[in-house]
Curated annotation (Swiss-Prot):
Keyword field contains Glycoprotein: no
Role: Immediate early (EI) protein that plays many roles during productive infection including regulation of viral gene expression and nuclear export of intronless viral RNAs.
Organism: Murid herpesvirus 1 (strain Smith)
Lineage of the organism: Viruses, Duplodnaviria, Heunggongvirae, Peploviricota, Herviviricetes
Family note: Belongs to the HHV-1 ICP27 protein family.
Protein name (record): mRNA export factor ICP27 homolog
Length: 841
């Protein structure tokens, strides 16, 4: 009985073979009888006892421990019914899908299956072929897995970014981006080329999310080599840390967050090493630092809120900045509050600045977790799997700039410091460096201080400066490498301000040849006819007067030396009339004839007499003949001087006048006459002072003649200006053949200044060039003055939006050459300063 009780309590032994007992076999406990080994109660035979699965005889006392009876093998498991219901529901949904949706679903299924197997799917393979390959790989006892590990699968795992070749515009259901947007691939490839740089394009939320615009950015990032991608990331890092204003930082933040939003909407795998994912953490700190430049204690103070100190404390916690000092015993409470702040939805904050910074912090935390996990796992990683606050769902493209700049301009307070800081915060700010310190007290090895001259250069505090470049001709010295023709624009580049800051500089490849030649001709004629503009008309007329008077005074001084008491012949009078009709073109004759005087001495006196009889053009610094007789000059330079040698030294006198004129050109004031003018006037005064005593009785006649001379000079100047304007208009409207025709002798003096510079002054290789505005990194000469646009040039801006430089067209007759500008010259180059914003790099 004792043995039976133990067995009853312990149940059957572990070595008891139930299968043998069921089939009638003899077990190891066969020495015991059937009744001794097992006791069955009334109504329960052995088969029912075994089928019930009871392991101990006291099951009647523990009925609640009795297991349920096993179902028949032919009946399906309970979960099979659930799968049938799910498949039936899914089948109904598939019936509602269209052909395009079904194609997208096939691509998604193929991508998921390939991702589950850990290998790269073939884009061209059909889903059925892919399924068969996957099934065969499962039934090959890991042979396929080993081959993948040593073949193409190893290359896939060594990739720095997940493969997104199967994510196409069609598979994602996207549209092509509008044609008015710049090409993303060209923007990234030509990011260091100033010619192809455009203003940032304003793109809407629908265009960014529903087109393939950002998908092209992502694919280009994946295709870049690791070295180029790292350089691009460093460029972005410096751009974020050196942003000139809060507006730029907010725009960069929206750019990064929009890129992440696109990945979340279309469920793209994240590349933790691309441009925008790598720099999202810097955006958070840059935004907080820019906001912290303002008076946050006043900006965050809202009526009815918790106070500015509490809101500022929350703002610092969002940016993971050290909390502000709190009272004793409040460290744990501050830590708990910061934990709650980081887990709150971004839009749950009541202040717009807090919401904007919370959105950036949430995106940065998601990407940071993915970047840390990518160091240990191969991925792929998706934004949806790490968004625990719903920040990616609540964000809309451009939301950061909207939250910040909808609140800051409307802030009103009585704090003067807050208003000054807010004004600076809403506009780009520049450096206020007044002096640069340099240590010149370095000691010698003997210990004595030695004063040295400054060697440190002042930092570039104004990086936004336009850079000018010019293209030299073939005859000049090649010290500066010329820029390529494709990067050349006009000498006065115009940017349409009505286009919202867009760059209207066209591409030479898309411009017709006629339009190209037309603007080339216009660019050259504009430098010749500088006096057509209203701003520089007076200055150019004064310059023309000084230049034309230079040649006339030389001939007049030579006539005085030969004999001023000779009378005028009728031929001289007739030549004077002809030259008066032709304008001031004949003024350059004295210089040409004086150079030929040594070879042809017999013709020098005639030519000088013809030149002396010519009346000078009007000028503010050239007095009339009568006024020169009445007003002797009081300056030492205009005092009477002895007569020059009669006719034996005309060349020496000419050289002396030219040398003195060149020396005086760089030291005289803008309103002062040149040396040639003063000496010519002094020669006239000395010659006329001898005959002034005999002509004193006719002073009234001289006054009347003076008035008539002034009227004639005024009429002549008006006629010349009108003819000059007509000439400029004809040149702008002329064809290429008309522009190539040589200029006849009866033309006006509109191009006299350029021709006379070539005759009177030696050609300088530095000045023989055609200036065109470009962004090539070349320094502008200090003698060139840069002027802003005048309001009166609006019509000219509309007419000449884009001017091109054609290297095949050379200046005609060497007329278009810019002389070296001195501090007193009035030759002014008009340059457009709107290109300064393009030289920030």
């Amino acid at each position: 009985m004792l043995r039976t009780g133990v067995k009853r309590r312990l149940g059957p032994f572990a070595g008891y073979d139930e299968d043998d007992a069921a089939t009638g076999g003899v077990s190891r406990r066969s020495k015991y009888s059937q009744q001794q080994s097992q006791h069955y109660y009334y109504g329960h035979n052995q088969s029912s006892y075994r089928d019930s699965g009871a392991s101990h005889p006291n099951w009647k006392r523990n009925a609640h421990l009795m297991p349920p009876p096993l179902s028949s093998p032919s009946s399906p498991p309970p979960q099979y019914d659930k799968n049938i219901a799910a498949l039936t529901h899914l089948n109904k949904k598939l019936d509602c899908l269209g052909p395009d949706d079904l194609e997208c679903l096939k691509a998604m299924i193929r991508i998921r299956e390939a991702r589950a197997q850990g290998r790269r799917p073939e884009p061209s393979s059909a889903p059925s072929i892919l399924e068969s390959s996957l099934v065969s790989s499962n039934n090959s006892n890991n042979n396929t897995t080993l081959s993948l590990g040593g073949g193409g699968g190893g290359d896939y795992h060594r990739q720095t970014s997940p493969d997104i070749r199967d994510y196409t515009t069609g598979s994602l259901g996207l549209c092509m981006f509008p044609m008015d947007l710049p090409d993303p691939i060209k923007l990234l490839e030509n990011r260091y080329t100033d010619n192809d740089r455009h203003a940032p394009a304003v793109v809407t939320h629908d265009e960014l999310i529903n087109t393939n615009y950002l998908l092209l950015f992502r694919k280009h990032f994946d295709a870049l080599p690791p070295e180029e991608l790292r350089v691009l990331v460093q460029d972005r890092t410096f751009a974020i840390n050196n942003a000139p204003s809060l507006d730029v930082v907010a725009a960069m933040a929206d750019e990064n967050l929009t890129y992440v939003k696109f990945h979340r909407v279309h469920n793209l795998p994240v590349n933790p090493k691309d441009l925008y994912m790598s720099t999202l953490g810097l955006i958070k700190y840059a935004t907080f630092n820019k906001l912290n430049l303002g008076e946050l204690s006043c900006l965050l103070d809202s009526p009815g809120g918790g106070g500015s100190d509490r809101e500022y404390h929350i703002l610092r916690q969002i940016a993971n900045k050290p909390a502000s000092p709190c009272r004793k015993g409040g460290s744990s409470a501050a830590a708990a509050a910061s934990f709650d702040v980081l887990r709150r939805p971004p839009l749950s904050f009541k202040h717009p600045l807090q919401q904007a910074l919370a959105l950036i912090a949430s995106f940065a935390r998601i990407v940071g977790v993915i970047r840390r996990r990518s160091l240990r796992h191969s991925g792929p990683f998706f934004i949806r799997d790490f968004d625990d606050t719903g920040a990616t769902d609540s964000y809309r493209c451009g939301m950061i700039s909207e939250l910040i700049f909808d609140y800051l301009p409307g802030h009103r307070c009585q704090n003067e410091i807050c208003r000054v800081k807010l004004k600076k915060l809403l506009q780009p700010y520049t450096s206020t460096l007044f002096f640069c310190a340099y240590n010149n007290t370095r000691k010698h090895p003997n210990g004595l201080p030695a004063r040295r001259s400054p060697e440190r250069r002042a930092p570039d505090a104004t990086p936004n400066i336009p850079r000018l470049a010019y293209r030299r001709s073939a005859t000049t010295s090649p010290e500066v490498e010329p820029a390529p023709p494709s990067r050349m624009t006009s000498s006065s580049p115009r940017v349409d301000s009505r286009g919202g800051g867009g760059d209207r500089r066209g591409d030479s490849s898309s411009t017709s040849s006629n339009h190209h030649r037309h603007h080339t001709r216009r660019a050259r004629t504009r430098s010749t006819h500088d006096s057509s503009s209203s701003g520089s008309r007076r200055r150019s007329s004064a310059t023309d007067g000084r230049r034309s008077r230079r040649g006339s005074r030389r001939g007049e001084a030579q006539r005085e030396s030969n004999g001023h008491h000779s009378s005028k012949s009728p031929s001289t009078v007739s030549s004077t009339t002809v030259h008066g009709q032709n304008g001031a073109r004949g003024d350059s004759a004295p210089s040409r004839k004086s150079q030929q005087s040594q070879q042809q001495p017999e013709t020098t006196s005639k030519e000088s007499s013809k030149t002396a009889a010519m009346p000078p053009p009007p000028s503010p610094c050239s007095p009339s003949p009568a006024s020169r007789e009445r007003r002797p000059s009081k300056s030492p330079s205009s005092s009477p001087r002895p007569h020059d040698p009669p006719s034996g030294e005309p060349a020496d006198a000419e050289k002396e006048l030219a040398t003195a004129g060149d020396e005086d050109e760089g030291v005289r004031s803008p309103g002062e006459c040149s040396v040639a003018t003063r000496r010519g006037s002094s020669a006239d005064e000395s010659s006329d002072s001898s005959s002034s005593s005999s002509d004193s009785s006719s002073s009234s006649d001289e006054e009347e003649s003076d008035v008539e001379d002034c009227r004639e000079l005024d009429l002549q100047s008006k006629r010349l200006e009108e003819a000059l304007e007509e000439r400029c208009e004809r040149d702008f409207e002329a064809d290429d053949e008309e522009f190539a025709e040589p200029i006849e002798e009866d033309d006006l003096h509109c191009s006299l200044d350029m021709e006379e510079d070539i005759e009177d002054e030696p050609l300088d290789p530095e000045t023989e060039s055609v200036w065109t505005a470009s962004v090539t990194p070349l320094a502008a000469p200090p003698s060139i003055r840069i002027l802003d646009h005048e309001p009166g040039d609006a019509e000219e801006e509309e007419e000449s939006d884009t001017d091109f430089y054609d290297e095949t067209d050379q200046p005609l007759n060497k007329r278009i050459h810019l002389r070296s500008a001195t501090p007193t010259d009035d030759v002014i180059m008009e340059c457009d300063l709107s290109y300064s914003e393009m030289d920030s790099d």
